[in-house]
Amino acid sequence: QVLTDCSTQVKKGEVVVVCGPSGSGKSTLIKCVNGLEPFQAGAITVDGISVGDPKTNLSKLRSRVGMVFQHFELFPHMSITDNLSIAQVKVLGRSKDEARDKGLKLLDRVGLKAHADKFPGQLSGGQQQRVAIARALAMDPICMLFDEPTSALDPEMINEVLDVMV
């Protein structure tokens, strides 16, 4: 059992950091919040939606909760712009042009607009992580979850990712 008797409430706009040693349940906690990991007891509610309720449409909930993983999880065979657009088109129903425009605005926000037509393998780890953050933001999430977003980066790349996160 990783988590026992934990309870918290996060208000809109708050930034919360969960710290602890390896194996203490940090990743499990955020995966439970997004419905990616089942939990045995307790309740998790996101924007009034119960994650543990069998009637909850977890796909719809996940489309509203931004999640950025430790290893970026970008599609290597797709351009950066396509990585930012695909979920907007397939999940949110945006037009390709609308999704591309939103993606380009977010790439500009994270300082990577000049790399829009490149592929993930052509970017540094810090750049890929900023693309992953932009991709999550493109979905207009109600909250953002980050799973060790800087642990796979070289020390000199950490600050550029942290600057984008806040």
What are these regions (language model features)?
Residues 1-166:
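ABC family nucleotide-binding domain
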